[in-house]
Amino acid sequence: MKSYRVPLVVSAALLLAVLVPCSIGETQGIQVKESVRFQDLSAFDAGLSGLGINARLYTVQYITTADSGQFGGTIFARNVGNKQLGSHWVPGDPRRYGVNDIFWTTDQVDESSWVPLKDSTAAIDRAMNTWQGVSCSAIPLTNVPDYGFDWGYVQWSLNLGGYPGWLADITHAGWLPAPFFDSIAPPNGSEYILGATFTFIWTEDGTPTDIDRNGNYDVAFREIYYNDAFEWSTEGPAWYDPEVDVETIALHEVGHGLSQAHFGKMFVDASDPEPPYSISHLHFAPRAVMNSVYWDTQRELLSSDVGGHCSIWASWPR
């Protein structure tokens, strides 16, 4: 599915309006927010329960296209009222290999229909290395082979391939067809979700754990999925191109994999008082990789991305 945004021929003033991040003080438009909601996704827990594994789905975070009238989203799969907490890895977690490494792998089975496997894998590798290179932290992000398995517990739960378990802490589980994304955001999530990160947390007697008492639920594993219904590219598409940049979305989703939430405010001009809003009037404050809407190729972390990362990972044991 191609998702065209705006005509190529635009004025210089419009280019400045949409491409230059506005400060909050400069923005005079209407603030729009990502969708944050509870949704019953307990069906994804059935397989884990049947296997005797005390891990349960906690959140699904997704990034959307800019021309969809959607502004990203976070789904909480556990309704704990006003006590929604963050989630993070536990150093040396005995339930997770007992080491400080964060293991990751890239599924080599569910490849993109648009980009050769070697190119999409290389783009994901670069995204992982970008986060690894942030100097304030010393996370040992350790790549492990996929061993030829079709990894993906969530897709297995939906009878779309996959595997009833996991190997790595963070799994890039591949490009999935439209029904996968419609199932997590019915009825038409596949029309606007580009990528999604699923976070599973450890539980004990059905209650989320926080064994290191840091105010975050303990992460068991995370899976990242990409929407094959969109046209993908590794050529660095511009904001007006129909393609979606693999590395940009991977960089964003890995941010979720490393416990970052969406960041930044979004505004539309008051000339669009009601949705759906015109894409040409969307502003970010500030612009960040972790904005909940995809705009164009952004392969470098910006200051807010680095700041968020350092606040989470600077104290990780070296």
PLM features per residue range, with description:
Residues V10-P21:
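Bacterial N-terminal signal peptides
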Residues C22-P116, S190-Y217, D269, P273-H281:
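Disordered inhibitory propeptide/activation segment of secreted metzincin zinc metalloprotease zymogens
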